[in-house]
């Protein structure tokens, strides 16, 4: 009986170590700050409205003339930003007319941006040339850290340019790939040789 209890304790200890390790690896989300010129709450629609809004969390910042949200609980909320939408993520700045933003577990999940076009610039001190791109529709996935450009997509790095109907830019890796080929348009890459002296 004593041997059984000893084995049971040992088994429970071994079972709890991975759980403890997983709990220690998980980081708490960073605090979210929200500043607005004005706000109002519509009890009938259960929506919150803002003007002159700025939301910041770590290296993420979202600014817009106006916004509406399904609530202030960032556990799971949907936001629509409109008018001079500007999103900063690390060294990347995205500009659009409107943006639909999803927050889950107190962190940015996805952003769907519309513009004529919606554009981005990725500035990096380690790189001599900025990367720029745009399309009518941009979709940012925070977990994958990718920016998908569809409908008139283009991306340039210096004098080199990519064009297509679906391009994907990996912010961390600074890589461009073509997405779906279902639109029937090929990816066109223009590479200009450096000027000769």
Model-derived regions: residue spans:
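Mature-chain termini and adjacent capping regions
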Residues: 1-197
